Amino acid sequence: MGNTTSEIQTQNVEAQPLISTEEQLSVDNPSIQSDQSVDTVENTVNDTVNDTVENTVNDTVQSIINKKYVHPVIDLINSNQSENEIIEVLKSFVGTNVVGTNENGQTIYDCVDQVELFGPAMQVFCHCACYGKKDVTDWILKNYVPLQVSYGDNFTFFETQKYKHFDISDMLVKHESFVPSYEVMQNLLSRSKYDLLEHCLNNPNLEKSHIDHYNLFIQYLSNKQYSNINELLVSLKKDSNTPIVSGNESETQPLQVTEIVNVNDNVTLDEISYSEIVTDTLPQNVESGIQLESTTEVKPESTTEVKPESTSEVQPESTTEFQPESTTVVEPESTTKVEPESTTEFQPESTTEVEPESTTEPQVESTTEFQPESSTEPQVESTVEVQAESMNESSYFQYNKPTYDI
């Protein structure tokens, strides 16, 4: 019996595997387990780094947004630093620092571009002058070259007067960039600053267009007629509401366009149209009238003759000649007859232009018009014969009336 039980247990043990499938895989392929662990570590590290960087960036951006940049020179206005500390900061930005000496023993300075810091320097200057920081104001007046003490119509001068910093306002008057005005000179006159008033009159920035006024100022100052100076300043202030500007500064006015001229580059020339040929007619006392055509010419080969018994002729005036147009020649019509009852004689006008008084206008398409291209020559059917006699190429024409029996 004992042997049977042991045999059954041996068979069960042999039927079961010695290790599990997962353990067998890890034993057979040890790289699988190592790769999984590496991936886990990498993911953990990446997440940690990303979170750290993101938090750091967000904190930095938020700090930049919350804190606005202020220039160190402008920051001097809000600080409680002493005047010496302010001067040291100004020296580091706009001052001239001594670097050393060269081979010849000359001093070498480190100069900066002061124009780049014009805005901050002007703000610090106005602040220190108005709040009575005389040492800083004096340092800026002597060391900052682009300084303009009269900006804003001498704003700093009148602010120092407002806060009763008269010594600083007197320092401004002596600066080379100061532009004196009538109000400034009145202020100096009221405070008995005659030397500064004379300095303003000799200031090159003072407008000296009215030389008579300048001479009067000098005369009143030399004679100590200060009341006259005040009256002159008041009268000049009434005449001119604008402050006196420097002679170097030009008063520029905006350009005003008064007229706008449109110019077209595409020039189109109109076609030259010659005047149409106009046919003028003489006063018509006959049936169809005598027509003047521009293209007709007098035929010199006409065989018609004037009978000697003709006693009535149309004689042009002694001083007036009938001048037809340059291309117009009179062509007598073959079918026209002279009415004996007509007592009207044709008198050419002195203006050499024939203006027909008849209400009948010449018809271009009339059958009585002579066609130069026609081969038919005019036939004289009546007893009246008209001769167009040419004295020369530019002579006048005579029209002879024939005699008739009553």
Curated annotation (Swiss-Prot):
Residues 296-310 have a biased composition (Basic and acidic residues). The keyword Hydrolase does not apply. Residues 291-406 are annotated as: Disordered. A lipid is attached at residue 2 (N-myristoyl glycine). Keywords: Lipoprotein, Myristate. It comes from the Viruses. Residues 324-333, 341-351, 359-369 have a biased composition (Low complexity). Residues 311-323, 370-406 have a biased composition (Polar residues). This is Uncharacterized protein R554. It comes from Acanthamoeba polyphaga mimivirus (APMV).
